[in-house]
Amino acid sequence: SSVMKKIIYIVGALMLLFPALAGAQALPFTAAETDAASLGTAGANLTQTHSIAGAAFSNVAAVPFSETKFDAAAGFTMWQPSAVKSNMINVGAAYNMKNKLGIALGFMYGMNPAYDVTDASGAVKGQFKPSDIAVNAGFAYRFIENLSVGANIGYATSSLAEGYSYGALAADVFAMAKFNNFKVTAGVANIGTAVTSKSGAKFGLPTSVAVGAGYEAEFAENHSIDVLLDADYYFMGAFAAAAGATYTFKDMVSVRAGYRYGGNSPLPSYASVGAGVKFAGVKLDLAYMLASGPMKNTLAISLGYSF
């Protein structure tokens, strides 16, 4: 549509307006999906409308298209246990008001391995445990039947050493369209303020132009499938893409699988599998990463409630 063409044009213009965001990246964890439902499809979730609890860290413009009125979940992720050995806690909720307005809130806390702190003589005087925190809020409006727009805004911070932490404001802006079973979206993710180090060097966030497409269908009454495809072009010059699918039986049992090509982006390549069960609104989701690199053995679990 002409509206989507204008959005893509604006996104292209933003790439020219923010050359300072290229190069080394700050707060790379802001580019990661950590909730179990999204990790089950290798992070492909921009047009996902069934599990919307994590929309504050993804695409809030999808919320007004959801058949769910309210969705909340809390999760725990063993992030890259074969490499960085971090643990992440995430909490999210989204509310779909009359399929017109969408509101989302999200919180993420990352706990990284402790390291020894030494004094000038080299003697160990204690330990420090680095941490990451992100808080997001989003709002979306579906102004015509087939089209919505939405924006998330939040603050992310990393504490790297005692007395040394840095943070940045960041936003995601998306438009999404849905035509029968097909869904498409385009926008900018993680656009925000630069981070300045103690030396005065500036580092940009992992900002990307993001597009997504999806197809969902129900068949033989009790079966449904949701196929998702996302792609990101990072202002640093890297490209990434993810494809995933979810099969659901009677809106009670789901199985998921996906693959992400990471290239030189902030997140490496990996494959994933996942599963979920739902009963009386209570849902449990699991995801496991299959990879030979840093994502090997990453495991996510979440417990939520939706209606």
Regions of interest found by a model, annotated:
Residues 1-36:
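Cleavable N-terminal export/targeting peptides
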Residues 25-307:
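Subset of outer-membrane beta-barrel
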